């Protein structure tokens, strides 16, 4: 299947459903492997190092997304610009956009490494991380960010490849890095008896491997999106476009992450068993999010390429098809998780209290995955049309401000952890109504004509 996939896909011609599905399949498989090796960290840590170490890894997840999310958002914006020029067949602009994006990634990766290592202790303390978990959380966080350049550049290179419709090569490289990560996890923790920091070290090494493989491919490919090391520099006009499209997406990621860090700090108040149980659920939720992730990526590329080629009706039809597929699959997975929650949580940790919290969160949230899928897909369509500021505003008002306000008030009225869990379905429902209105208006189709 992987070898049969084309190197790149022009979304502007051929069957709409086939183009989206053929592009989404490698994205799905790639995200599946990424989630598997993220889950491998938690499974190995939870079973070999215990609840404290599992809580440390779990508490670091939202914080890592906060630090990395903004840069990944910029990369998403860059992908929109690259896809637009690829769809319009403007080679010179395409080359400038790619090399400016890579230059940004190098600078951002260096800055992220320094900030992540310096700010780790202070932020974890502000999150209310329990004292018995804090030392291991700091070690995990600092080790991860010491190697964050690999994560940043991997996302940059994958963004370039996906924006020209190449999902095959990122998938192959991700499978390789996933295997490296799992083998190193087992070797460091089970074999050498190293601590929680070794799980982060294994992740960092595997990300460098995947970034290097992507870079070598871009340097060797004989296509208009070929990378030339001597051409890596900032082009002011391209940087402006990337920032215009990327900052709203980056800010949106940061807004979501800030809200999730706030949620995590409230969960931390219920103790390390709640932290471990909810952390286990978050790994399971990552699998449910896979169809959402692959269709959002596919939709952003599809819409951007077709609007760049001025094929407005085709962009609309593709958007409707992608949204329908995503919400259907996400809801089916949600039902499975609701039913199988006890078995799934037990795989991470057999402590009854850990299982209790994990199952409780699973059965509060899982049946509402269709709302999450819908919100993210419409946000992806808007980003692909050059309207990245619109989903940013919706996420800021709903997923951040309203979610934080709700939890702040609700927990004081009813100090039950389920009150925190309900924040997610509630805010997903509100954003879905708003995005449905924006999508049906149809003005997003002409977003590029304003820029």
Per-region residue spans from a language model:
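Helix-terminus/linker motif at the lipid-water interface of multi-pass membrane proteins
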Residues: 32, 36-55, 124-131, 187-194, ...
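Alpha-helical transmembrane segments and their lipid-water interface positions
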Residues: 34, 38-45, 68-75, 79, ...
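Short runs within selected transmembrane alpha-helices of multi-pass transporters and secretion channels
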Residues: 75, 143-162, 170-178, 199-214, ...
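Transmembrane helical elements of multi-pass membrane transporters/channels
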Residues: 22-41, 143, 154, 177, ...
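Residue-level signal for short hydrophobic patches within transmembrane helices
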Residues: 13, 17-36, 40, 63-70, ...
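Small-residue hotspots at the loop-to-helix junctions and early N-terminal turns
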Residues: 51-62, 137-141, 200, 272-287, ...
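Short alpha-helical transmembrane segments in multi-pass integral membrane proteins
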Residues: 1-24, 82-147, 191-247, 303-368, ...
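Small-residue-rich hydrophobic transmembrane alpha-helices
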Residues: 54-114, 151-170, 264, 278-341, ...
């Amino acid at each position: 299947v992987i070898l049969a996939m084309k190197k790149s896909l022009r979304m502007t011609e051929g069957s709409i459903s086939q183009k989206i599905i053929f592009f989404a399949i490698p994205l799905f498989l790639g995200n599946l492997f990424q989630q598997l090796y993220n889950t491998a960290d938690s499974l190995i840590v939870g079973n070999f190092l215990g609840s404290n170490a599992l809580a440390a890894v779990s508490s670091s997840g939202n914080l890592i997304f906060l630090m990395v999310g903004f840069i990944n958002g910029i990369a998403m914006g860059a992908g929109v610009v690259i896809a637009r020029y690829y769809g319009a067949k403007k080679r010179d602009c395409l080359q400038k956009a790619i090399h400016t994006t890579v230059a940004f990634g190098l600078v951002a990766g260096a800055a992220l490494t320094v900030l992540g290592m310096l700010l780790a202790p202070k932020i974890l303390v502000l999150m209310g991380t329990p004292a018995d978990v804090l030392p291991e959380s700091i070690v995990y966080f600092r080790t991860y960010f010491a190697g964050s350049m690999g994560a940043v550049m991997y996302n940059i290179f994958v963004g370039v490849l996906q924006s020209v419709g190449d999902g095959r090569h990122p998938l192959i490289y991700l499978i390789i890095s996933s295997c490296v990560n799992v083998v190193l996890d087992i070797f460091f923790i089970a074999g050498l008896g190293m601590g929680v920091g070794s799980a982060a070290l294994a992740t960092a090494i595997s990300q460098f491997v995947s970034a290097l493989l992507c870079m070598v491919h871009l340097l060797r490919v004989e296509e208009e999106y070929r990378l030339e090391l001597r051409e890596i520099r900032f082009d002011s006009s391209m940087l402006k476009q990337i920032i215009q499209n990327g900052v709203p997406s980056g800010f949106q990621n940061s807004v979501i992450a800030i809200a999730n860090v706030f949620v995590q700090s409230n969960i931390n108040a219920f103790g390390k068993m709640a932290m471990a149980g909810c952390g286990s659920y978050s790994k399971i939720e990552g699998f449910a999010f896979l169809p959402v992730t692959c269709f959002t990526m596919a939709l952003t590329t599809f819409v951007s390429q077709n609007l760049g080629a001025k094929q407005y009706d085709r962009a609309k039809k593709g958007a409707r098809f992608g949204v329908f597929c995503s919400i259907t699959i996400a809801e089916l997975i949600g039902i499975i998780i609701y039913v199988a929650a006890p078995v799934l949580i037990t795989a991470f940790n057999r402590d009854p209290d850990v299982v209790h919290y994990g199952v409780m969160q699973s059965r509060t949230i899982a049946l509402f995955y269709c709302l999450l899928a819908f919100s993210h897909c419409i946000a992806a369509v808007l980003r692909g049309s050059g309207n990245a500021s619109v989903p940013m505003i919706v996420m800021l008002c709903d997923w951040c401000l309203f979610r934080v306000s709700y939890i702040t008030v609700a927990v004081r009225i009813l100090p039950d952890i389920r009150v925190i869990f309900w924040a997610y379905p509630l805010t997903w429902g509100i954003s879905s109504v708003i995005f449905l209105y924006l999508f049906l208006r149809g003005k997003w189709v002409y977003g590029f004509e304003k820029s």
